[in-house]
């Protein structure tokens, strides 16, 4: 068991850290040689936008929402402890999943839109982007499992 105040502090710290990482993910847009504003207009470039929003929703807003959920559990139901293993599994799965999905979708979108911008056919662009498909899907799956562990932890805390 772990004190719920510790869980709230950890989730809040991670949401601030993820906000900083989200700002860092925006820096490549400011480098003119990478041509991000042009590449986003090509069809694979939307993967870069999706990757960024997945990270924002899962890692920044998601961690803030979990901070709020655990805070409500503490204040409204006066629950003092939750399961330590479920909390750590939730944090690890959410963080790794968000980073994995974001990095590989961003990378695949950049490679694909660069190829499309240089005039390659859609078939070739699709083949070039295949490397990012499985890791991106794995990241999304880890995000879902992390949220499932959080929900399970809330339910188990209510029952005790």
Explain the meaning of each model-derived region.
Residues 43:
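Active-site-proximal inter-transmembrane loops
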